[in-house]
Regions:
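Short, charged alpha-helical segments
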Residues: 77-81, 85
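Charged phosphate-binding loop/patch that engages nucleotide di/tri-phosphates or the phosphate backbone
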Residues: 85-97
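Conserved binding/recognition cores within well-folded domains
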Residues: 1-78, 97
Length: 97
């Protein structure tokens, strides 16, 4: 579970993305959200990411943001609704390290 970067919907299918692989999962995002450890976080209606693998967050002019992960070209979009909670979660993690 630790090596999963994010889960993302693609049509009716949910994919688990690792650095170099993609796997299909049978669960819906809302089910994953309830089952996953606390270092995973919903960041849009179509994505849940692993906060342990965030390399950078870039805020766009449209108020949405893009998260990149170290060692891969993969990225996830964060809706403006989830941006502040994500930043708060990362700050909290940083303070408890």
């Amino acid at each position: 579970m630790d090596d999963i970067l994010f889960f993302q919907t693609e049509g009716d299918v949910i994919h688990a993305h690792k650095k170099d692989d993609i796997y299909e999962t049978k669960y819906k995002l809302y089910q994953l959200e309830e089952m996953l450890p606390g270092f995973f976080m919903r960041v849009s209606k179509s994505a849940i990411l692993n906060t342990n693998h965030i390399y950078s967050i870039t805020r766009n002019l449209t108020a949405s943001s893009t998260v990149t992960f170290a060692g891969t070209h993969k990225q996830v979009f964060v809706s403006r609704y989830y941006y502040k909670p994500l930043i708060s979660k990362l700050e909290e993690k940083r303070l408890h390290q």
